[in-house]
């Protein structure tokens, strides 16, 4: 049976408040994304190719040859990388289980970016942090960038690459058959980006991290909307 009309009205009113809050959260996210885009577009500095700013691009697995085979490392599936710029989940695996296979190797502080469609266009990329023993392996469909800390801040580099503008340019140069198109590493190697002073880079990096944290909080609030509505129903109907 339907609840009394006054109860129905209260349920609708409270649920509409949640819908309004979700709409406001989405608007805030869009505004923050515009702020980030504008911040990166306004960066001034000498233009330099990424290959000159990295100590390694798609680093060799030989880096870990001397490590114990039984040592646990982080394994990252493509599905475990969000479209929002972070790793959502890792699985600890022995180094021996992942080193000899076709998985991509990376380390703490490296940048991983999906190279295959549609993952790249969707924004699957991350700054690899919190890796088990500082080592990660993952999908063969990642490109990996290791910033030269003397030349560029890794968060600044990630902030510059994790943008729709860069993804649009990357999509234009994809090669391969439909459904298996990939961004060639040469696109990133030859990509020129502005490199301000290290102090300026660090300021931008800190601001970027703060803005991304704000986006993450807002998205969490949006994700909780359904459970909040269910709580309203439970309050009035149980």
Predicted regions and their residues:
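A short glycine-rich beta-alpha junction/loop motif
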Residues: 1-6, 135-143, 175-202
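Short amphipathic beta-strand starts and helix->beta connectors
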Residues: 128-130, 173-177
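Generic alpha-helical structural context detector
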Residues: 41, 55, 114, 158-162, ...
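A short beta-sheet element
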Residues: 102-104, 108-162
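Periplasmic-binding protein-like
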Residues: 166-169
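Sequence-specific dsDNA recognition surfaces
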Residues: 51-65, 76-111
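Short Gly/aromatic-enriched secondary-structure transition segments
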Residues: 69-71, 128
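Non-catalytic DNA-recognition/assembly elements of restriction-modification systems
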Residues: 2-65, 194-205, 209-238
């Amino acid at each position: 049976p339907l609840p009394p009309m006054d109860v129905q009205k209260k349920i609708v009113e409270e649920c509409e408040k949640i819908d309004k809050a979700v709409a406001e959260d989405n608007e805030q996210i869009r505004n923050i994304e515009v702020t980030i885009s504008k911040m990166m577009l306004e960066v001034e500095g000498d233009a330099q190719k990424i290959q000159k700013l990295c100590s390694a691009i798609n680093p060799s697995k030989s880096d870990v040859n001397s490590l114990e085979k039984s040592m646990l490392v982080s394994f990252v599936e493509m599905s475990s990388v969000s479209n929002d710029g972070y790793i959502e989940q890792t699985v600890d695996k022995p180094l021996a289980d992942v080193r000899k296979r076709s998985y991509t190797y990376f380390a703490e502080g490296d940048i991983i970016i999906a190279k295959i469609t549609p993952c790249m266009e969707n924004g699957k990329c991350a700054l690899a942090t919190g890796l088990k023993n500082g080592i990660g392996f993952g999908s063969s469909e990642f490109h990996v960038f290791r910033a030269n800390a003397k030349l560029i801040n890794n968060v600044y580099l990630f902030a510059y690459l994790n943008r729709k503008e860069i993804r649009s340019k990357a999509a234009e140069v994809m090669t391969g058959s439909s459904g298996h198109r990939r961004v060639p590493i040469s696109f990133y190697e030859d990509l020129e980006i502005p490199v301000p002073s290290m102090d300026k880079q660090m300021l931008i990096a800190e601001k970027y991290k703060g803005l991304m944290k704000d986006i993450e909080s807002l998205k969490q609030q949006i994700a909780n909307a359904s459970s909040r509505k269910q709580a309203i129903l439970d309050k009035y109907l149980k």
